[in-house]
UniProtKB/Swiss-Prot annotation:
Ranges annotated as biased composition (Polar residues): 44-60
Oligomeric form and interacting partners: Homodimer.
Protein name: Tropomyosin
Keywords: Coiled coil, Repeat
Domain notes: The molecule is in a coiled coil structure that is formed by 2 polypeptide chains. The sequence exhibits a prominent seven-residues periodicity.
The keyword Disulfide bond is annotated on this UniProt entry: no
Organism: Mytilus galloprovincialis
Bias kind Basic and acidic residues: ranges: 32-41
Transmembrane segments: none
Length: 284
């Protein structure tokens, strides 16, 4: 009888110990599941941060490309303005050369006109001399008539040259007026281009400032990209570590569940044995 009582006490203590171990295992299982849930939340948060980091990186790269495209467009516009200024400068030089040539032609025509006037005056003087010397011999008269005829021819040629010179002078004056008009238009265009160049210069300075700011932003973007890349790598590493931890915890949960099941089976066996013992005692 004492042996049975001792056995019952031992079985009762074993039952209590089994209950304690079961409660401890259940508590450990709950803690493990909570840790697993926390790690899964951290993992999901890291995934969201990783996606946000990639989006930030894409946006930064897009902004950098936009700044570079605007800078290249501005450089092309500046080059086009410089080419236009060079072309107008060449046209102005050509107009100045045309004006100089027109002035030279005008000077030449004036000289020829003066020569023609002198020849006409000389012919008139010869004619008057011939009239005063009308009493000379026939040979002298013939000679003088020839000289007069020659003088008239020279005068006619001088008149023709004068008319030609006057015509050329009129053409030259028209050309000069046109050249002056073109020169005025060119000067106005140059003034306009100088104003545009001033504006372009101001724009260039602004663009240089913007370019410097863009370079600073680019450096900042690059630093941000490096930081985001490092954070992304760190997040990926943490995510990988979290996956490993979740896997370990899942294995631990499975082990604890198996151990809890084993303890429950032991508890059931002890309970069945106690029930059988009580039934046996009741039979006495």
């Amino acid at each position: 009888m004492d042996a049975i009582k001792k056995k019952m006490v031992a079985m009762k203590m074993e039952k209590e110990n089994a209950l304690d171990r079961a409660e401890q295992l259940e508590q450990k299982l709950r803690e493990t599941e909570e840790a697993k849930a926390k790690i899964e939340d951290d993992y999901n948060s890291l995934q969201k941060k990783s996606i946000q980091t990639e989006n930030d990186l894409d946006n930064t790269q897009t902004q950098l490309q936009d700044v570079q495209a605007k800078y290249e467009t501005t450089e092309k516009q500046i080059a086009e303005h410089e080419q236009e200024i060079q072309s107008l400068t060449r046209k102005i030089s050509m107009l100045e050369e045309d004006i100089m040539k027109s002035e030279e032609r005008y000077t030449t025509a004036a000289s020829k006109l003066e020569e023609a006037s002198k020849a006409a005056d000389e012919s008139e003087r010869n004619r008057k001399v011939l009239e005063n010397l009308n009493c000379g011999n026939d040979e002298r008269i013939d000679q003088l008539e020839k000289q007069l005829t020659e003088a008239k021819w020279i005068a006619e040629e001088a008149d023709k040259k004068y008319e030609e010179a006057a015509r050329k002078l009129a053409i030259t004056e028209v050309d000069l007026e046109r050249a002056e008009a073109r020169l005025e238009a060119a000067e106005a265009k140059v003034i306009d281009l100088e104003e545009q160049l001033t504006v372009v210069g101001a724009n260039i300075k602004t663009l240089q400032v913007q370019n410097d700011q863009a370079s600073q932003r680019e450096d900042s973007y690059e630093e941000t990209i490096r930081d985001l890349t490092n954070r992304l790598k760190d997040a990926e590493n943490r995510a990988t570590e979290a996956e490993r931890t979740v896997s370990k915890l899942q294995k631990e949960v499975d082990r604890l569940e198996d151990e809890l099941l084993t303890e429950k089976e032991k508890y059931k066996a002890i309970s069945d044995e106690l029930d059988a013992t009580f039934a046996e005692l009741a039979g006495y």
